[in-house]
Amino acid sequence: MLMLCPVVFIALQRVTAGYGMMYSKKWGPSVGNRAGWIMMEAPAFLAMLALWLLSARRWNPAPMVMCLLFLIHYFHRSFIFPLRMRGNSRMPLAIVLMGMTFNVVNAYLIGAWLFYVSPDDRYPASWLTSPLFLLGIVVFIAGMAINIHSDSVIRHLRKPGDTRHYIPRGGMFRFVTSANYLGEFVEWTGYAILTWSLGGLIFALWTFANLAPRARRIHERYLKEFGKEYSCLGRRYILPFLY
């Protein structure tokens, strides 16, 4: 899977996923955005929960804490984020199924490693005070904060019934077009550090490979719609000052 990351990154430079502001009926049957997000994200939450509760290691402090961080993220994405959405946008079922597969596979890779595959002494209780865990959890929390704040900014751009696009401002939007995607990438980079695992690394790289091309598409869309008003802001796509 690690080797597929550059393939996905290159492929998505040419294919635009038809959801959100890029929604297209060409992607086939669709469902409401709220239902789509729940269908796409909740299976990962349930998969990790099952892997945890069925494991003999379920009460080991370090794996349990790392699992809970994963579950907190996916509980928010599955049950809080969708219910706070505004408007009546739709999401193609094809996108829902692809996203569901991506999320469940990553949940399995991480959960299987934490509770079944890793050596019994890989994550002692002292791991929770190790430099890697402490650095990782700071990065993880920072990424989550950026993601949640950026989603809130986007959500409040429109009043009920308004379908126009507006330029998001404030927070990390001062530096990038897709601050919400930046937050998600930072979050999973932190998770890769705090677990120090191949599964965590794969998830972080897959997140970037999936979101970076979309951030570029959104940037191009803003430039087309807003012209100099947007270009003068000097924002990058997803990584401040870099990309």
Feature map (PLM): residue ranges:
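Eukaryotic endomembrane system proteins
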Residues: 74, 81-131, 135, 141
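Hydrophobic transmembrane alpha-helices
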Residues: 1-11, 48-52, 59, 102, ...
